[in-house]
Amino acid sequence: IKKAKGEVEDFGGTVIVKAVDYGNVEQTLAAMNKLKEAGIKGLVLMPINDKRVLQKIDQFTEEYGISVVTVNADVEDTKRICFVGQNSVQSGRAAAGLMHDILREEEGTIAVISGIETNTSLSDRIYGFCDEMKKISPKTEILDTKYCFEDDLIAAHLTESILNRYEDLSAIYITCHGEKGVCD
């Protein structure tokens, strides 16, 4: 972010960075309001798929005339001008193909650990992974997704709980930060 900020400022632009706690809707809305009050002309946002945030994006574009670009996670049903990021469904499909190649099993059990439900990028990865695994390994059981809020300690507790319950677990698919907690 610092590098991109510097590049924009080299061209005479001004960049204001407002960090919020991951998944915190209230902080996101407050930051958006403060940025509007600061007179911004455009907003780059990693959105949360929450009705209030989606409405605020539309308000920014329609009422305030502030262009909004979403990054990393998309919210298609808004007035944002574009999305910059990966095809998360395809990323999930690719992960399923790699998982299948690594496991080389016709059946097994796979746990899924993700960040938060309201991050569309993460939920799209899960969808792509599960959909592809059903096609290429229909006998593989995919457990219900558990959420670690991208926290290593929570991820570690979830992993321990999963391993205690499923002694024959084949793999864990993790879509977010928290990998240290899963692997340690």
Question: What residues fall within each predicted segment?
Answer:
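Hydrophobic alpha-helical segments within soluble ligand-binding/sensing domains
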Residues: 83-109, 155-156
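Short, ordered loop/turn segments at secondary-structure junctions
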Residues: 20, 48, 72-75, 115
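Amphipathic helical "hinge" segments at domain boundaries
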Residues: 1-30
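Short beta-strand segments enriched in small/hydrophobic residues
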Residues: 2, 81-82, 109-118
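Short, surface-exposed alpha-helical segments at coil->helix boundaries
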Residues: 29, 89, 93, 122-130
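Short helix-capping segments at alpha-helix termini
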Residues: 7-11, 63-64, 133-140, 165-167
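Flexible loop/hinge segments that line or gate small-molecule binding clefts
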Residues: 51-90
